[in-house]
Curated annotation (Swiss-Prot):
One of its GO terms (cellular component) is ribosome. Keywords: Ribonucleoprotein, Ribosomal protein. Residues 1-26 are annotated as: Disordered. Belongs to the bacterial ribosomal protein bL28 family. It holds the Pfam family Ribosomal_L28. Gene3D superfamilies: Ribosomal protein L28/L24. Disulfide bonds: none annotated. This is Large ribosomal subunit protein bL28. SUPFAM superfamilies: L28p-like. GO terms for molecular function: structural constituent of ribosome. One of its GO terms (biological process) is translation.
């Protein structure tokens, strides 16, 4: 399962509740994109969330 290289965000799991309070499993997935960034001075392709890209936590190479 893919995980954000910068923030560590990954798929979270929970329940979907209907009006009758029935429950089924569901998941929330972060919007991950594979991008090239500098890691220890070398370019590397890693999974990064779009939230981290928009906030400027990483810069593309």
């Amino acid at each position: 399962m893919a995980k954000d290289f910068v923030t560590g965000r990954k798929t979270t799991f929970g329940k979907k509740r209907s009006h009758a309070l029935n429950q089924t499993n569901r998941s929330w997935k972060p919007n991950l994109q594979k991008v090239r960034i500098l890691v220890d001075g070398k370019p590397k392709k890693v999974w990064v969330s779009t939230r981290a890209l928009k906030s400027g936590k990483v810069t593309r190479v």
